[in-house]
Structure formats: C-alpha cells, structure tokens
Amino acid sequence: MTIAKKPLVLLIMDGWGYRPNMPDNAVANANTPVLDKLCKDYANNLLSASGMDVGLPDGQMGNSEVGHTNIGAGRTVYQNLTKVTKSISDGDFFDNKNFVDAVDQAVAAGKAVHIMGLASPGGVHSHDQHIVAAIELAAQRGAKNILVHAFLDGRDTPPRSAAGTLALFDEKYAQLGVGRTATLVGRYFAMDRDNRWDRVEQAYNLLTQAKADHTAESALAGLENAYARDENDEFVKATVIGEPAAIEDGDAVLFMNFRADRARELTYTFTDSNFSGFERASVPNVHFVTLTEFADDITAPAAFSSERLTNTLGEWLADHGKTQLRISETEKYAHVTFFFNGGVESEFKGEDRTLIKSPSVATYDMQPEMSSIELTEKLVSAIKSTKYDVIICNYPNGDMVGHTGVYDAAVKACEAVDSCVGKVVAALKEVDGECLITADHGNAEQMIDPVTGGIHTAHTNLPVPFIYVGRNAEMASGGRLCDIAPTMLNLMDMEIPAEMTGTPLITLK
C-alpha cells in the first residue's frame, strides 16, 4: 500500500525582492492579497541573496544560477565570477593550460584568436574585465590577430550602457598595439536558452561568415547606429565592424561567459557534430575553449573546472529514500534542476522533473502571466497526488518580466504569481502539506534606474522574502539563501549533512 505523503513545497518567486514601497516597485504596488495575508498570518523574514552571502564579491547583485545553487547546496558556494577574478589578480589566469594551448596552436599556425562573450560589467553571465584579461593573454602569447565578438547586455545592465565596455576594449587594444572588436550583436540573439534557433543562427552566421545586415567602421559607431534604429543593447542586430573577420579553420575561440545556461546553445553550434538546430553553412574546425564547464555533453575543454558539491539537498533527500519533484517553465527549468543540484545534469533516485514550455513571445511583457496557470495546474496535481516528500517550483514571472523594464507588465506578473500561490497553498492544506516561499534574487521591486531616471532591467542586491506556511513557529531574524535547505531538513525531522553550513531558521512551537 502506498503511503500518502505530506509534501513540503519550496516556491521560488524569481526576481521578487523586498524594497520599501516606491512608485516604481512592481512587487509592492501589485495587488497581492494572498502573499499579504500569508505574511500577516505566518512566520516570515527577509534573506540576503547577494554579495558575499552567496559567494559573490561584496555588493554584487545575485542572480538565478547563484541563488539556486546556494539554496540547493545549503552552504555559501563561491561563484565563478569570484574565482576567475581572483585568478586574474593572482596572475594564474595567464598560465591557464587550456587557454594557453588553444592560443598557442592558433599563433603557431598564423591564425586568429577570437574572444567572444557578453561584453558587460554586470557580473551575472560574464564580466568585461575577464574579456580584457583574455585579450591580454592572447597578446602575451604572441597573437597578432585578436578579434573580439561583443555580445551586448542591456538586461543585467542599463538598456543603453554598452559604450563604456566597448571603449574599455578600445583602450586595451591601443595599449597592447593589437586587437580589435570585429562584431556586435545583442544577447537576445547570441545567448538564447529556449531553443529559439532562429535567433542563435543569426549570431552564428555573424561569427562564422561575417554575415550581417549592418556594418560600421568602429564598435562605438556601430552601437550609435543601432541606437538610431531604436535597438537597445540586448536587441542590437548583427553588425560587422571594420574588415569582415569570420571564424575559420585553425583559429582559437575563447568563450568568456562563466554562466552556463545562456552559453550552451551557441557552444553546441561550434562543438556538437550532431547539431540539428539549423543548417550551418560553415562549420569551422577550431580550438574552442569555454571559460567554465557549460554541460556534461559539451566536449570542448573548459579553462576552469566546476566544483563538485556533495550532499546537496537533492542528493541528501535521494540518499534517504525521499521522493522529490522539480517543476518550472523553460526559462527557469535548468535552475530548479541542474543548478539546484550543484551542477549535476542527471536526476537523483526518486527525483521527477516536469517542464512547462514558456510562451513563444518576443518579450514577456507581452504575456506577463507567462505559463503560470498551466504550471500551477501541474503543481497542484502533484501536491494532491501525495506522491512527493518535497517539491521545488520556480515561478519565473518577476524576473523575466522585470527584465523587460515594463512596469505595468511587471505588476501584472506579480499579481499572476500571487494568484498561483493561493491555489498552491489551498492544495497543500487539503493534504496537510507545508510550504516555504522565497526568491532567488530581486528584480521587479525596482523598475526605474535612480541614477538615469530610465528603465531598470537588471537584478538588485536587495533582500528576498522567506515565508513558512505550516505549523505554529518562530522565524529567526536575518538569514541567507544557504539557510533554506537546512531549514527544510529540520522541518522534515531529518539530519543535516556536515557539508551544509547554513543554519535552520525556523523553530516549531
């Protein structure tokens, strides 16, 4: 006979930070009666989700990869941004074997060194100082033809802010006497993660064929031309800068993004012999190196290997015979699976996964509810099945709509999530289950840039909510994302592994 389980559900409201009420605060100004009542009736506090508390440099805003990794690990996990930056300051970066080998082979054959990545100081997917260091490394190794392919941000940075980074690159070329920016394209095309191969194809054709609708004599001129076409950084269409310079056989290609989820698709176009996303007109045989490990099935060498996290929440639950479900939309599916499991692709024993397809719209302000209704239906069904001990669910709306910078849409996104939370809590009460509600980082609570007065599309470094909907309890003040997993295990009356250095925050009365 199957024993009915009383599930503990962790709801992660992506991009939902806490900020005192302001006119541009979509979270506070949204009509959220469910969450308002939960905060009134149940134990709750705020958690730190940025900076050193999640393994990032002081003051650095959190992000979804970092947030989910810390939540799932139950400990502060020092992030790739921190590791790579330290290796540059220590000098170890310039002796990195995989980078050096690729560059040296290209130099010996008189070929080019291509450096591509998100040209941004945002620190979420990349950092422009890492690209500068790669330019320096190539120059030190004797490269005479260093070509930078700049993917423009405007999502983790202000919408029209790329000029500073492009000027930084120009200064470095002038200082070294070698190198130039060869192409520009917005991250909308180069960094898709939802199998929108028509977008990726445009970036790939720019890189491998120098195929573009636009040209310019300099990177800054190309950027200004894009702005004149009313294209913000994220959406800049493929642009060739100066003499066309496509990636060719024998060249070295260094992909300088450190975050995996939005780097995988473009990497597959270069490295997967069975690639079928689109017909590739050119498939150059290159020395391709990624900055970090993007996926188990990517064969290209990585300059920095991933830290193996043992006894994450998912692994610990599996080892103790517990069942678990991970569920989200396409946009955050990798976060509740791969990142939550500490970079492990495969499911643990007793772990099921449910993927709900995100809507096919150009930008999510066009459909701020995204696929939350279908997601909630599947989640409620899973709760009522009493099959699972633990369910991890991510609602992407606050983050994905917050990134558009459209305030009214962000308000609607928050209201949609609130309605869904109400249905989840009602289902849990039917089966005597419990719920923890939190976020991985902030976003929608700040929609106007206080400096420029323009729209704010980036994450914030503000705290996030933590609500316990369950038994009568007290909540400790303070806390970090890494405290969530130990808190969950404590609520389940389970031992906490030694590797989890987070602190349980809830005391049952």
UniProtKB/Swiss-Prot annotation:
InterPro entries from the UniProt entry: Alkaline_phosphatase_core_sf, BPG-indep_PGM_N, Metalloenzyme, PGAM_B_sf, Pgm_bpd_ind
Coiled-coil segments: none
Cofactor note (record): Binds 2 manganese ions per subunit.
Cofactor(s) in the UniProt record: Mn(2+)
Catalytic activity from the UniProt record: (2R)-2-phosphoglycerate = (2R)-3-phosphoglycerate
Pathway the protein takes part in: Carbohydrate degradation; glycolysis; pyruvate from D-glyceraldehyde 3-phosphate: step 3/5
Binding site for substrate: H125, R155, D156, R187, R193, R259, A260, D261, R262, K332
Keywords: Glycolysis, Isomerase, Manganese, Metal-binding
Gene Ontology, cellular component aspect: cytosol
Active site positions: S64 (phosphoserine intermediate)
One of the Pfam families matching this protein, by short name: iPGM_N
Positions of Mn(2+) 2 binding: D14, S64, D440, H441
Function (record text): Catalyzes the interconversion of 2-phosphoglycerate and 3-phosphoglycerate.
Matches recorded under PANTHER family: 2,3-BISPHOSPHOGLYCERATE-INDEPENDENT PHOSPHOGLYCERATE MUTASE
Subunit structure: Monomer.
NCBIfam families given in the database record: pgm_bpd_ind, PRK05434.1-5
Name of the protein this chain belongs to: 2,3-bisphosphoglycerate-independent phosphoglycerate mutase
Organism: Psychromonas ingrahamii (strain DSM 17664 / CCUG 51855 / 37)
